[in-house]
Amino acid sequence: MSSSYRMELDKWLASLDVKADMVLDIGGSQLPVRGRTKTWVVEDYKIADLPEPHIESPKPDIEVDLNSHSSGLEHDYDIIFCLEVFDYVYDPYNAFEIIKLGLKKGGIAWVTFPMMYPLHQPIEDDALRYMPSGITKLAKAVGLKIVQMIPRRTETDAIYNAFRTERMRCAKHEDHNISGWIVEFTK
């Protein structure tokens, strides 16, 4: 069974209408966006991923490593999806630059960011978690504009209750049942 974190993303994707000439799915080898949205009217769809993304995953159309300074993105995409990738990114500034480089002016990038997620496989690649202010600062630094930040909420209050039990000082007047973000950027 999928995690509530994944189910929240799938629910959001199932409500999304996608209509574009060119769409890039960064990290999409394992679980492509195509086939998961409400509607899909796309002329040219490409997957960009690591050369050997996952065991038994298809090879990507374009080889891209968001932690590397050579991107391989040479097109202006109308829409870029980068879902469930940023927990493996240890150079987020570079990753933001690559997304900006691939996005056409006025295009949209949908990117997910984990805020709370346990260490997971492959553990040697699991790197970072993101807070809203960090996402905002990275976007501003590379010249991307945030259109919206959609919170991904936990199903229960268990995580917040764990913070309280451990006497961690949570910021007042904030929702501590948010486990991550779905962010819409534009160039």
Name every feature range the model reports, one short phrase each.
Residues 1-75, 79, 179:
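Conserved N-terminal segment of class I S-adenosyl-L-methionine
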Residues 18, 90, 104:
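Short conserved AdoMet
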Residues 25, 82, 111:
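Redox-cofactor binding/interface segments in oxidoreductases and associated redox assembly factors
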